[in-house]
A protein has these predicted regions:
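C-terminal motif of bacterial Sec signal peptides marking the signal peptidase cleavage site
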Residues: 27-30
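A cross-kingdom marker for long, charged
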Residues: 203-236
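Residues that mark the junctions of alpha-helical repeat units in TPR/alpha-solenoid scaffolds
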Residues: 36, 43, 83, 179, ...
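N-terminal Sec/ER secretory leader and immediately downstream segment
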Residues: 36-113
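Structural register within alpha-helical repeat arrays
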Residues: 50, 90, 167-170, 186, ...
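Generic helix N-cap/helix-start motif at coil->alpha-helix transitions
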Residues: 40-52, 80, 158-167, 196-201, ...
Length: 236
């Protein structure tokens, strides 16, 4: 089930979190007798979006601040399960940049997390053995169902939403299954969105491969792109 999205930034990765929080916004256009959603819901969703966008753009300070404020908003409810859900969404965004560090924020709350959240956490940790596909966001179903590497890569590249597409590519990379075409697709996705952090990371992956092949032209071209992003490009 794909949650409704009320903002320009892709939020399908937050399917579990927004299913509970953002759906409240839909009542604003309904009957006048329906009370508006509480402020904490709207604030938490907005802050999570801000944290994700800041991370993807490479602004760690803004990410940290937005996550801190988001946690404060959710803490007002006493809902540990919702906080765990939000932490998981934040970790999923980091994975798009090949950051596979433990999801400490979720792990400390996992005992109170919903079963579906725990399944998603396993998916993000690439622990797929015996994982129930139906418990996960629908856009990952085809990739997870494929045992053949080529078909799994194709399924990942066909994911329509950019952030889940990057996450799928990252998880294939983590398991050593990502094909060069999937790495190229990840670069194209991050570039098109202007997501500096994952773009740099995926370009480094491609640069490493070019080095291993001794492809001097590819190495030079990739380094020029990296230098441009880092502001180190030589003036004309």
């Amino acid at each position: 089930m794909k949650p409704q999205n009320t903002k320009h930034h892709d939020q399908t990765t937050n399917w579990l979190f927004l299913l509970v929080l953002a759906v409240g916004a839909l009542t604003l256009s309904g009957c006048s007798s329906t009370p508006p959603p509480p402020n904490w819901k709207m604030n938490a969703v907005s802050l999570l979006e801000r944290a994700q966008q800041s991370w993807l753009e490479g602004d760690s300070k803004a990410t940290k601040l937005a996550l801190h404020k988001m946690r404060q908003e959710i803490a007002q409810t006493g809902r540990i399960d919702l906080l765990a859900r939000a932490e998981l969404a934040a970790c999923a965004t980091r994975i798009a940049s090949l950051d596979f560090s433990p999801c400490v924020g979720f792990d400390t709350l996992a005992a109170d997390a919903a079963a579906s959240d725990q399944a998603y956490a396993r998916f993000l940790a690439a622990d797929w053995a015996g994982l129930e596909i139906k418990a996960l966001p629908a856009h990952y179903a085809n990739m997870l169902a494929e045992k053949d590497d080529a078909n799994a890569n194709l399924a990942a590249r066909k994911i329509k939403d950019p952030l889940p597409r990057l996450i799928a590519a990252a998880l294939l990379f983590r398991s050593g299954r990502a094909e060069p075409s999937t790495v190229a697709a990840a670069i194209e996705t991050a570039s098109e969105r202007g997501w500096r952090r994952p773009l740099l990371t995926w370009l480094e992956v491609q640069l490493k491969r070019a080095r291993s092949l001794g492809d001097q032209d590819a190495m030079a071209a990739l380094q020029r792109r990296i230098d441009l992003i880092l502001g180190q490009a030589k003036p004309p």
